[in-house]
Each structure stands twice: as C-alpha cells, then as structure tokens.
C-alpha cells in the first residue's frame, strides 16, 4: 500500500494518472508498478503474488469510512459531526481531495492540532475497522479481495 499523494512523479504510471478518471487513476499506477517490478525481477518473479494498492490521496481518507469511529479512535468524539460533514462532500472516502491544504490529514489537523498522524491514524484504523473501510472504499475492497484469492 502506497499513497499517490506523496508519490514522486517518476514512479511508474504516476505522470499518466491525472489524465484518467478517478476510478482509473489508481488502477493505472498499480498496473504500471506491477509491470515495472516484474520487468526488474525477471522470469523467476511471480507477478500474481505482487498486489499493489495505491491510495489516491492519503491513508486518512480511508478512515472517513466511519466518521464516528474515526473521531472516537483519536479520542475526539466531539469531532464526529465535522468528520461526517467532510465525508458527505465526496462520493467515497477514497476521493477526499489531495490539495496540500485540504488533504485528509490536513482536514483532521485543522480540527485537532494535536493529531499525531502515525500513532493516531493507526488507533483510528483499529476503531474504524476493515469491514467499514471495505464497505465504503471500492479500491481498498478490491485489493483485499485480490489478496484473499492468493494461494499460500
């Protein structure tokens, strides 16, 4: 899992992504990354076992899958209405925008200056849970399904 928001333009497929529809952006970058890794590793590499997932904006976007639990997970339940207001502006949490000013983490930090991204994001993810993220985020759900289909 990598986020496209901070990904250098030199990553495979990254410069082509903005020309795609939102639904195709991540898939384009994922295909190009997989092809690049496969080319670099050669014939002994099994590309079916490399399953990239590109979060188009930031990890925090996924946490908006359940605004109430996101707020509780960072010990700020009073922020739930504001998180819900952010969430309802977008078709899916994966689409919460990526401007340097309004990126998902910046939205959280604007409401809660003490937000500590690595620690609190992890705690919130536990509260939000995979079921909510999979239900609300088609790209994440698809990635999880591809991982589940891998044979061990």
Regions picked out by a protein language model, each given a short descriptive name:
Residues 3-152:
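C-terminal accessory helical subdomains adjacent to catalytic cores in phosphodiester-
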């Amino acid at each position: 899992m990598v986020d496209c928001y901070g990904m250098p333009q030199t990553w495979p497929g990254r410069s082509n992504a903005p020309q795609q529809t939102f639904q195709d952006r991540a898939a384009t970058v994922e295909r190009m990354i997989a092809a690049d890794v496969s080319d670099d590793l050669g014939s002994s590499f099994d590309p079916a076992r490399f399953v990239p997932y590109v979060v188009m904006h930031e990890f925090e976007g996924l946490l908006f899958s359940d605004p109430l639990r996101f707020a509780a997970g960072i010990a700020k339940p009073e922020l739930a209405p504001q998180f819900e207001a952010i969430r309802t502006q977008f078709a899916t949490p994966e689409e919460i925008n990526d401007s340097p000013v309004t990126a998902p983490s910046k939205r959280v930090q604007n409401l809660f200056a003490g937000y500590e991204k690595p620690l609190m994001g992890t705690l919130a993810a536990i509260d939000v849970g995979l079921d909510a993220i999979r239900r609300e985020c088609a790209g994440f759900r698809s990635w999880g399904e591809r991982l589940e289909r891998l044979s061990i």
